[in-house]
Regions:
Chain B
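N-terminal secretory signal peptides
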Residues: 1-18
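N-terminal active-site segment of His-dependent metallophosphoesterases
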Residues: 22, 29, 38, 42-116, ...
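Extended active-site neighborhood of metal-dependent phosphoesterases/phosphodiesterases
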Residues: 52, 111-205, 227-242, 254-265, ...
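Active-site neighborhood of phospho(di)ester-bond hydrolases with catalytic His/Asp-centered motifs
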Residues: 64-65, 100-104, 131-136, 209-210, ...
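Short active-site segment of divalent metal-dependent hydrolases/proteases
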Residues: 69, 107-108, 138, 214, ...
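Surface-exposed cleft-lining segments at the edges of enzyme active sites
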Residues: 71-73, 106-107, 176-185, 215-220
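Short, well-ordered beta-to-alpha junction loops that form the rim of enzyme active sites
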Residues: 175, 209-214, 246-248, 312-313
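Short acidic, glycine-rich surface-loop motifs adjacent to enzyme active sites
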Residues: 201-217
């Protein structure tokens, strides 16, 4: 069921690029950005062929917030291959806006098929108005390990 | 899922006879080098790649990958230029390759204009043939229809195929269409693999191309294929299987029993090592460092001598 209120908006391209530039090259010099406790399988060979890569975790601190408590907001950021906040709780009738702040394209696609954005390139946004209560799990169809949830209260 | 990187499935998983044959064919002559003569890894290998390349009976092919035409981020502001240099570098190899395989993510957004551009650029390759497999960026929102319209001629199913050349059996798989966290082949394609190799002698060297790795390189980022183990089960009786993939934008090599996996680098932009950082976010390297992270791969196989050499070269 395609719902009303689905629009594609294209502002904020410049803003997205500025943010990305801010967490690009210079981030490698920021101490403490490495994610602790992640298992890194050592390359069997030829890992050395990429000099410099190992010193560039290049993560924006805080953007990779794990499964946190539900957040009341009408804006979801897509950054560092994650929807943030990962779970939002809204009231029926609320319009949510997703904005892609990655250099990679992403989509916002309900697993139930209830809504499906076009491909969002860097800086592009997508809006959807939730007219029925319920729990909506969604993912990026290009990177389906990116999952998140919208909880719509009556 | 196949065995996690660095896990079980070592030599004990294959018979001693298989191991010896495999080593004779592959382990003795794996050569990983970069341009400018700087040797990164050189395992055994009495016959150098150069000597093999001069053998008229040798099979020589090139793998290029992840050109992402249409990408405009800071990680590479000129992906067209770097892909063009990669093509020039292939054309400058000592001898004309029998074929060039692009292992997917030809485009960044699957637009018709990007497909037109990449096809036009691939026509500049001087090679016996040019093949492709699709990446997930080549099948956005249309299950690969635009990709197959341009590159699917002569393929089966959703774009998979195989061929024989100079004693080697080559299989090209599509694992980017039915994504559920990981790459996926599906029952039709698994059946294709089973039938495709059914009549082959176990001595036939197999080379398998796919975009997403057929081994579990880093499943949390989707770097694996959920039903690859079933496909590989059909290849277990062969003395040597070489799987070449893209997708991860970095060199990585792993051996599981009779199968050796080689992830290729990209011509567009590097990605982090597995698990370093929040996700597979394009890396913007300091000025002047990008070229060293990009590259091409050329592979040589000499019939009879059962030697194979893989050279990974930085983008010039």
């Amino acid at each position: 069921m395609r719902q009303l209120g689905t629009t594609l908006v294209l502002p904020a391209v410049a803003a997205g690029i500025v943010i990305l530039a801010g967490c690009g090259g210079p981030a490698g010099a920021v101490p403490g950005t490495a994610v602790p406790g992640t298992a890194v399988p050592a390359p069997v060979s030829a890992g050395q062929a990429m000099p410099g890569m190992s010193m560039l975790p290049a993560g924006a601190p805080g953007a990779a917030a794990g499964p946190a408590a539900p957040v009341a907001t009408d804006a979801v950021s897509i950054q560092n291959f994650a929807f943030s906040p990962a779970t939002v709780t809204i009231r029926t009738g609320t319009t949510l806006t997703w904005t892609n702040r990655d250099q990679d394209p992403h989509t916002v696609s309900a697993m139930s098929g209830a809504f499906h954005s076009p491909t969002l390139n860097t800086g592009q946004s997508y809006q959807h108005t939730f007219t029925t209560p319920g729990r909506f799990d969604y993912l990026c169809t290009i990177h389906p390990f990116m999952t998140a949830t919208v909880v719509v209260a009556p | 899922m196949s065995t996690p990187a660095g896990g079980a499935g070592g030599p004990e998983a294959m018979s001693r006879r298989q191991l010896l044959r495999h080593t004779a064919w592959f382990g003795a002559a794996v050569v990983l080098t970069v341009t400018g003569g700087e040797v990164i890894s050189h395992i055994g290998g009495t016959p150098t790649a150069t000597a093999i390349a001069q053998d008229p009976h040798a099979l020589r092919f090139v793998q290029i990958s992840d050109s992402h035409l249409g990408f405009t981020g800071s990680a590479n502001t000129d992906v067209t230029g770097s892909f063009s240099r990669a093509i020039d570098q292939v054309n400058a190899l000592g001898s004309r390759p029998d074929f060039v395989m692009h292992t997917g993510d030809l485009t960044h957004l699957s637009t018709s204009a990007q497909f037109d551009q990449v096809r036009q650029m691939l026509r500049g390759l001087r090679a016996g043939a040019v093949f492709t497999v699709p990446g997930e960026h080549d099948s956005i929102d249309d299950h690969g229809q635009r990709y197959r319209a341009m590159f699917g001629t002569g393929t089966q199913g959703d774009g998979w195929y195989s061929f024989d050349i100079k004693g080697v059996h080559v299989i090209a798989l599509v694992n980017t269409l039915a994504l559920e966290k990981l790459g996926h082949l599906g029952t039709d394609q698994l059946e294709f693999v089973r039938n495709d190799v059914a009549g082959l002698s176990a001595d036939t060297p197999l080379v398998v191309f796919s975009h997403i790795p057929l081994f579990a390189m880093y499943p949390a980022w989707g770097w694996g294929t959920d039903d690859a183990t079933q496909a590989l089960s059909h290849l277990r009786r062969f003395s040597s299987v070489t799987c070449l993939n893209g997708h991860v934008h970095q060199l990585f090599t792993k051996t599981e029993g009779n199968v050796t996996f080689h992830s290729a680098t990209t011509t567009a932009y590097p990605l982090p090592h597995p698990g370093q950082g929040p996700g597979p976010v394009p890396l913007t390297l300091p000025a002047g460092r990008l070229g060293a992270a990009l590259g091409i791969r050329d592979v040589t196989y000499r019939t009879g001598r059962h030697t194979l050499a893989i050279r990974d070269q930085k983008l010039a």
